[in-house]
Amino acid sequence: MPGDLELAAVAALRRALPDARVHRGSPDWLMRPGRVECGPRWDLVQSVYRALAQRDLCETMPPRERRQVDAVIEREGEPPRIFEFDESQHFNAHRAVTLRLYPDDVETAFPLETWLSESETSTKKLGRTGGWGKAKPPLFPEPGGRHVQRAFRDALADLLPAVHGWAPTLRVADFEVQGWIHSPQGGALMGNLLEGRLK
């Protein structure tokens, strides 16, 4: 279930983009992306998975590999766009591994260097048991697999939109909004934050 901050961020996004349809859901190509869905970025996705898991990615994703993005943004005359609200668990050493592998031609709708810096300097302890750190077979069966799975899924959401004619995934971090996300000015401040990210 979405957390309080995520719900507030999506609500502020709707106020910031009154002409857009902002809704829950995930594009079909992101549900279980294998070789076909990754298209020309299959080798890149393979290299990301290999760096995280030290083995090759199967060409067809297992049926249990499903996911939900935080929101999809649709505006008339523009390609659709994924919105993701990244809380502290999205910034860690595994995410840094993925971000370092992005080639220069990967367009992002978030400050890549900020995301990399936050991931490299995160002091968040990565538990290897319990809900946050449990194994996530079949792709990430080791203890702590949930953390690695999250980093891989974030990378897929960044790398695959261009393959399918979608705009770059828009990311907003909790540390960018915590001081004002629940305020009456949240929508306007979200709009200010997004200037330059929505091109």
What are these regions (language model features)?
Residues M1, E59, P63, G145-Q149:
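Conserved aromatic-histidine-acidic binding/catalytic patches
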Residues M1-R21, R150:
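Nuclease catalytic cores
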Residues E6-L7, R66, D154-A155:
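Conserved glycosyltransferase catalytic-site signature
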Residues A20-F85:
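Active-site metal-binding core of divalent-cation-utilizing nuclease and nuclease-like domains
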Residues R35-V36, H94-T98, S183-P184:
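Short aromatic-enriched loop/helix-cap "lid" or pocket-rim segments at secondary-structure transitions
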Residues E37-G39, P184-N192:
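Short low-complexity, flexible loop/linker segments enriched in glycine and/or proline
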Residues S88-G179:
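Catalytic cores of nucleic-acid endonucleases
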Residues N192-K199:
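Acidic, His- and aromatic-enriched active-site or binding-groove loops in soluble protein domains
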